Amino acid sequence: SRRKATLGVLLGCVFTVSFMITLLVVSLKTVADDLNSTTGVISWAITAPMLAFGVVGPAFGKVGDLWGHKRVFVGGLFIAGVFAICTALAWDAPSMIIFRTLSAAGGSALGPAAMAYINRMFDPSERVRPLGYWSFVTAGAPVIGVVAGVPLVSIFGWRTIFLMQAPLCLIGCIVAWWLLGDTERRKNVKFDVQGALSLGIGSVLILLAINRGPAWGFISARTLSVALLGVVVLIYFVRVEKRASDPMLPLQWFRTRNVAFPVASQALTNFAYMGGFMIVPQLLEIGLGFSTSHIGWLIIARPLVFSLVAPFSGRIAMRFGERNAGVIGAIAVMFSMLLLSQVDAGASDLYIAFGLSLSGMGLGIASPALTALLANSVDVADLGVASAVQQLLNQMGAVLGAAVMVGVHEATISSGIVKSFSYALLAGAISSAIGIFAASAVRRTPRVL
């Protein structure tokens, strides 16, 4: 059917802007050596796009809601493809980081637009299943990228990553323009420029302070100044939105139970999920002396299980309800952190893989259900910006989790290397436990139209 074909195109295009993320992470040293730089500098090719991906999304989501998501989707994909070519041709570290960031900024348009299409195509009672497929793609793409891409990178070099991505993006533009239908355009509504700029600037300052906290020091003057400036800008954003006739982000959403609590639960579980992504490989390498290849095949268990569980999350949600699916998922992530916090020299590969798999299973169950609850609680005309705000807050939770859990490890390293990693993972367990309570606070409500 056309609906299935459209879903396939949306997910295929999302895959093209997602598959290289983990592959680039494992190739940082190769990139640094080729560009006569250091991994510390080249790591900004991960950090800067991550900031751009979360921050630019709300503006793209709002533009799509106002002027049509087809143009935003195809335009974002085109930008991602053009700057992927530029990244492949980068001549030094700054050019590579800039081009990669611009490519990610274009790719950030796809998430809100694709979610808006999915939520328009499927009735509220049907949304969990296609959102499960969405989670399958977003979790599975990095796995496929690593498995298929590492051999190519080792033979042909890191530029292969982007030489593969660019034609996929441009082909996706053609297919999407041909197949996707136009969404409705809202007349006599202005784009909230002040709101978009203040939300974007405030968010990037907060994310930057969180991300650089471990390097600068969480209580250093630089970190506190950046964070304080971010808070001031976000306060200004709230004042702008209260006065705006057509606000960028309806503030009343955060007083709606099925908007505030699903977003909070996802951010809290992403805190643990992303923090674990940073901590566990270090635990295995530095604490236990595992080889890089050994670690790679162990940590792949988490996104693999995520991608396998997500397509079935619809059945789980329909059987037990979205709230229970969110609670079950957060519980699984919490137990994952608790199990991994007990890893020591005597832990078996099976035990470690099981602990990692629980994290993947938890997010695979919870994310589609909580995303569907959010979509069912906002007006159809605001689905793009709602999805983008969810993307932004999830990103904030992930960045905060990575920074805080690394900070806990560094602050407690005097107690022993392995023990300090254990304390960091316990911080993730606490965050997930709070996420359980947030998920339990949601309820099924009629969709607000």
Residue locations for each model-derived region?
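C-terminal membrane-cytosol helix-exit motif in multi-pass small-molecule transporters
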Residues: A166-R185, G200-R212, L229-A244, G435-R443
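Helix-breaking motifs and short loop linkers at transmembrane-helix boundaries and internal kinks
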Residues: D34-N36, G68, L89-S95, D123, ...
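12-transmembrane solute porter fold
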Residues: R3-M20, L24-L28, T39-P49, F78, ...
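Cytoplasmic helix-loop-helix junction between adjacent transmembrane helices
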Residues: T101-F136
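Membrane-interface helix termini in secondary transporters
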Residues: T30, P58-K62, L66, P151, ...
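Flexible interhelical linker loops that connect adjacent transmembrane helices
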Residues: S1-K4, S125, C173-G200, K242-R257, ...
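Helix-loop-helix hairpin linking two adjacent transmembrane segments in secondary transporters
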Residues: W134-I174, F191-G200, I206-A227
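Conserved MFS/SLC helix-loop-helix module at the cytosolic interface between two early adjacent transmembrane helices
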Residues: V55-P94
